[in-house]
Structures are given as structure tokens and as C-alpha cells.
């Protein structure tokens, strides 16, 4: 987003960013960040979402702001991977625990629901295919890569063997990429043909992974024209307990 790459720093409990060439590194958020796990950028509203495994929250901030607020706080065990659908106004995330689940809510904190809660082990990676209308995830315990249609009508298995400990997960074009802890490598699989190969090998301590097309940005912000061209991070009244309380919008 705007020539930056964003990441969580678990050692200092902060969210940071830098330019794509590595210069200009800076800290965005470093207050009340307890074990940040995964992040996702809303390129339409210019906002940043992240999961807290320490506080069991999902939070959000504007990209030009150091203030942040809680998006979801209840019925959370151990939030991990997160993915956004800005055009549909949806956020998806994985919740670990004794009964792992994949959940969804509106970006304005409403309509929290469970999408998948059966036959999950250690779901780690999460990737949203906007063109095909599918949500993919990798499971480090069942050694599978699976998908569910965003309308929740069909669940399918893409791969189910020789996938030890999938960690992070991303999608670009026709390929899903993931970090393989035990193999110290980055691998990919074709989302239709299911043929796979190794991209990079012999890289220990692999963690996060994100692939993006910087030349292709999809979606517009309906609030921008009413705000002099600036996007707005808007809040609205929740319909369920545990979602953020209504408050005044702030500009990104």
C-alpha cells in the first residue's frame, strides 16, 4: 500500500512498515500490542487490521494514525490469520483453540458468524480469492489446503498429502504460496490444476508471507467523495455483543 510493506514485530510488540526497498522503516503502533500475530491492509479505506493472540482481539487503525480500536473482542480464543474483502466489506479470520473455527464479520463490526468449525486441526494460513469467490486455508495438523466458497455453499480440498506444518499463506494470480516450517522453504500450488513446486529452499525460521500485484488495485471507497477525496474509517452501531461500540469516524 503506497509503496510500503507492513509487518508485526513480536519481539518489541509493535506494528511497523518500510518502503519496498527497505528504507524508511518506522513504527506505526507500539502501545497495547500484546503478541500481534497477523495483519491485513484494507487498500480501499486505507486502514490496517491485525489479530492479537495475547489479548484475544482483532483491532484496526488508519494508515496515517497511531490510534486504534478494538473490532472484535468476545468469543475469541486465539485469533490468528486474517484476510479482508474490502469491496464486500468483510473480514475473515482463524480462531485457534480447543475448537478451531474460521469466522467472518462485516468491516463495520456487524454480523459476526462462523463459516467453518468442523474437521479443523491447526488452521494457519488464510487467503481470499476475490475473482473466484473462494476462501483458502492451510491446516498444519491435517496437512491439507482447503477452500470454501464465500457464499458458504461448497467446501473442497485442494491438497491433502506431504504438507508438513503449513504456516503462513498467500495467493497471487493462479497460485497459492505458503511457508513450510519443517522443510525450511516457500512452496506454491496451482489453485486449479493442484500441481506444486518449491520456490525457495533452505530458509530457516520462515514466518509471514504475502504476495501482491502492486499494479492492480480493485475497489473504491464510497466515503472518499464525501470527504474531499480522503478515505474515512467509519464506525457504526453493532448488532451483536462483543463487537466494537459506536464512535465518531476518523479520517485516514
Swiss-Prot record:
Swiss-Prot/TrEMBL keywords: Repeat
Residues in coiled coil: none
LDL-receptor class B repeat locations: 3-45, 46-88, 89-132, 133-175, 176-218
Region (Disordered) residue spans: 223-247
PROSITE patterns: LDLRB (PS51120)
Keyword tRNA-binding (UniProt): no
KW Transport (keyword) present: no
Protein name: Low-density lipoprotein receptor-related protein 5-like protein
Source organism per UniProt: Homo sapiens (Human)
Gene: LRP5L
Amino acid at each position: 500500500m503506497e509503496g510500503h510493506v507492513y509487518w508485526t514485530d513480536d519481539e518489541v510488540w509493535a506494528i511497523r512498515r518500510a518502503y519496498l526497498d527497505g528504507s524508511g522503516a518506522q513504527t506505526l503502533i507500539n502501545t497495547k500490542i500484546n503478541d500481534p500475530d497477523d495483519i491485513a491492509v484494507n487498500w480501499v479505506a486505507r486502514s490496517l487490521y491485525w489479530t492479537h493472540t495475547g489479548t484475544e482481539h482483532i483491532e484496526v487503525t488508519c494508515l496515517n494514525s497511531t490510534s486504534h480500536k478494538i473490532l472484535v473482542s468476545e468469543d475469541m480464543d486465539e485469533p490468528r490469520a486474517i484476510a479482508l474483502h474490502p469491496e464486500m466489506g468483510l473480514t475473515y479470520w482463524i480462531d485457534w483453540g480447543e475448537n478451531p473455527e474460521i469466522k467472518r464479520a462485516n468491516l463495520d463490526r456487524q454480523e459476526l458468524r462462523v463459516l467453518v468449525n468442523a474437521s479443523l486441526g491447526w488452521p494457519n494460513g488464510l487467503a481470499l480469492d476475490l475473482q473466484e469467490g473462494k476462501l483458502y486455508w492451510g491446516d498444519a495438523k491435517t496437512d491439507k489446503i482447503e477452500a470454501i466458497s464465500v457464499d458458504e455453499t461448497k467446501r473442497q480440498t485442494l491438497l491433502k498429502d506431504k504438507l508438513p506444518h503449513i504456516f503462513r499463506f498467500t495467493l497471487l494470480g493462479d497460485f497459492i504460496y505458503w511457508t513450510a516450517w519443517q522443510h525450511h522453504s516457500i512452496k506454491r500450488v496451482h489453485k486449479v490444476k493442484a500441481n506444486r513446486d518449491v520456490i525457495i529452499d533452505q530458509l530457516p525460521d520462515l514466518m509471514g508471507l504475502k504476495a501482491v500485484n502492486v499494479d492492480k488495485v480493485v475497489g473504491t471507497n464510497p466515503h472518499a467523495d464525501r470527504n474531499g477525496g480522503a478515505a474515512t474509517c467509519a464506525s457504526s452501531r453493532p448488532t451483536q455483543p462483543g463487537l466494537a461500540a459506536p464512535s465518531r469516524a476518523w479520517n485516514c
